[in-house]
């Protein structure tokens, strides 16, 4: 795959994912610059060698795109805008960390981020910048325009909501920085997923494309769910023997109906406290499906069912597959799922199916692990309905 093609196509994928949360241009900019260092004569010589290959990673290519962006930012009319500089730093870290995250400040107080932004010699950076602009058919004015548009997205999609959160909750400064780190992880996740997905496509791994068009998945799943529940209700009524069994059945039905009706409320964090055997799995699934089905396609990315133990995850997955009527819509992800095929392993790390059943440990890895395969999944949580079973 040609480098220019990779940058453009990975950028298009990032744009489509980023647009779902209002940062399409911002995400595109990260991808268009992430491998800019590969335009260098040094890297091209390295990649084309057949014998005596240097050790993998010996030629740094991940810093150049960030340095190029920072250089153009310093020469732009926006170089004195504090929030714009914050955005450029977020993008720059995303680019420099796309092969592995690192601490910006080490234990000795050294600024490692600044070190990463001063790796490429000026002469080599000028060469890379010239080739990047030529091959990408970009002008400096076009890049400046993209930065300006990305800044607008950053303000609308992140800074304004963050300001609202801080005002409503009287959030301390340290918490504000935590939200900043979440934004950084989101950008890095979009970059890793877009990079890996495009590379997989170029290698012919069609299974790693977006697994399915979700336009009607949730509507179909909800219809199947309702038919499944009607079937269970009919079977149950035929087998009810005692008054106590009838009461339990009616309570379960009422709980499920109330959960379905609750889907009309706005987005938020809600708790469903019920005793064992009350039908939480199917009741919460009904709520999630109705929320997803009534929203526009772009507004609900996935439904997640998070369980504390593998055994519960396995049981819940089987229940959910039967309820939605199509196994291809449901992915089960935990350490007991054995995929010897490398392609299937990649699919597992991507979390692209409409409904994901996984364990709390995999969920926490996605939130906090330093491994790229976990970071990759992070952006899939955006605009999703997340059900946490037996949250501790």
Predicted feature descriptions by range:
Residues 3-228:
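Accessory nucleic-acid engagement/destabilization modules that flank
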Residues 234-273:
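Conserved pre-motif I regulatory segment
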Residues 265-272, 301-302, 352-354:
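Pre-Walker A (Motif I) flank of P-loop NTPase domains
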Residues 265-289:
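Walker A/P-loop
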Residues 274, 335, 390:
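The Walker A (P-loop) glycine that initiates the GxxxxGKT/S ATP-binding motif of P-loop NTPases
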Residues 283, 288, 299-324, 337:
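Conserved Walker A/P-loop ATP-binding site and its immediately adjacent core
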Residues 326-368:
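Inter-Walker segment of RecA-like/P-loop motor cores
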Residues 361-363, 374-392:
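SF2 helicase catalytic motif II
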């Amino acid at each position: 795959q040609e480098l220019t093609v990779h940058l453009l196509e990975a950028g298009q994928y990032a744009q489509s994912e980023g647009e779902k949360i209002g940062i399409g241009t911002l995400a595109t900019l990260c991808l268009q610059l992430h491998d800019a260092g590969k335009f260098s004569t040094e890297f091209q010589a390295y990649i084309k060698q057949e014998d005596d290959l240097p050790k993998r990673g010996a030629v740094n290519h991940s810093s150049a795109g960030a340095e190029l962006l920072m250089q153009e930012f310093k020469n732009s009319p926006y170089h004195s805008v504090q929030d714009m500089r914050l955005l450029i730093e977020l993008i720059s870290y995303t680019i420099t960390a796309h092969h592995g995250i690192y601490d910006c400040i080490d234990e000795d107080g050294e600024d490692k981020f600044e070190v990463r932004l001063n790796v490429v010699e000026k002469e080599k950076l000028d060469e890379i910048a010239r080739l990047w602009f030529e091959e990408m058919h970009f002008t400096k004015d076009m890049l400046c325009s993209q930065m300006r548009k990305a800044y607008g997205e950053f303000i609308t999609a992140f800074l304004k909501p963050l300001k609202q959160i801080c005002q409503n909750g009287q959030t301390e400064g340290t918490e504000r920085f935590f939200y900043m780190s979440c934004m950084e992880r989101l950008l890095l996740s979009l970059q890793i997923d877009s990079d890996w997905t495009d590379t997989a496509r170029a290698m012919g791994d069609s299974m790693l494309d977006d697994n399915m068009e979700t336009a009607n998945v949730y509507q179909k799943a909800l219809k199947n769910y309702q038919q499944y529940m009607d079937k269970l209700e009919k079977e149950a009524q035929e087998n009810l023997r005692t008054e106590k069994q009838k009461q339990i059945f009616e309570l379960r039905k009422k709980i499920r109906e109330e959960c379905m009706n609750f889907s009309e409320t706005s987005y938020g964090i809600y708790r469903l406290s019920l005793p064992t055997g009350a039908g939480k799995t199917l009741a919460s699934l009904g709520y999630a499906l109705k929320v997803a089905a009534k929203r526009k396609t772009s507004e609900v990315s996935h439904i997640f069912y998070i369980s504390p133990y593998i055994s519960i995850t396995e049981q819940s997955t089987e229940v959910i597959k039967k309820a939605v009527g199509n196994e291809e819509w449901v992915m089960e992800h935990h350490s007991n799922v054995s995929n010897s095929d490398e392609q299937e392993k990649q699919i597992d790390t991507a979390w692209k199916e409409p409904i994901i059943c996984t364990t709390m440990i995999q969920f926490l890895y996605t939130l906090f692990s330093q491994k790229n395969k976990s970071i990759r999944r992070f952006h899939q949580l955006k605009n999703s309905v997340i059900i946490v079973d037996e949250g501790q």
